[in-house]
Amino acid sequence: MSVAVLAWALAACSESPPDDSAGGGGTGPVGSGGAGSTAETSSSAAEGTASSATTGAGTGGGGGAPPDGECASVSEVPTELGLDPFYKKYVDASGIPIVSSEGPPDAALLRACSVVVRMLGPRDDVRQAMIANHTRVAVMAETEVTSDIPEHSDLYEAFPGTDWDTRARGLGATPARPASSCAEENVLCYPSDPYRGEDILVHEFSHAIAIMGIAFAEPTFNRELADVFEGAIQAGKWANTYAATNKDEYWAEGVQDWFDTNIESIPGNGIHNEINTRAELREYDRPLHDLIARYFADDAWRPSCP
């Protein structure tokens, strides 16, 4: 889980809206679930960058037909999107483009689309903010690497000292780099996926929802999240877990729990603890549960492997 931590170091530079809890400014990637090295700085919606992950989808990144017949087919990338010619495939996820090269199978884009549509369902204001910020999701082929994604192709130059292609199989969207990425092998739950057990897309897209959507729709969100996080830490919760890293990873790990796409560890192992489901989150950290409940549907849908 070392990738994510680096991400928030990159997050120190962002362009999302400032509020009373954090300043603006910046361009780099944000932390994501599944990392473990030492952190340099914390990332946030107000700091905005790309959240990085080395987590995987044990329960998968797809599952459940999206509403209204969305995510039914893959097409060419509309020219009006103005995207890099690297992208050849496209699916519309309620206004959020899901794109890839020719490499990934169509099934990977369709399952990513399904997850995005379901996660965005309840809050149209957040979705509209994300659309206005040109948020998109890029699906890497199993044979592709992070720097193949055009929005992330400069990471080695912008943030030297990290081997992004080795360490990251997913990054979250920020105003400077508005693509969230995920990987074919994780989305489709291949046996070869080294990160089975978690869902990169759920974790990373939850960062994008916060950074590219909620922070614009609700300018006080960062402060509220910070207060909830600080209260949990002061109460001794999330000790020896990745959720304790900063408010952004606290949020993303909580969203994974909400969708039952996290890993359980008893005792805590520095990354996870015994909390990995919505019901357990409600009992363990009610303020975080209730904050998340404002943005995601409290229904029976969960991502699932094909």
Regions found by a protein language model. Name each.
Residues G69, P78, P85-F86, A93-I96, ...:
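Acidic/His-rich structured neighborhood in mature extracellular/periplasmic domains
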Residues V74-F86, V99, L155-P191, L225-P306:
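Metalloprotease/metallohydrolase-associated module, dominated by Zn2+-dependent proteases
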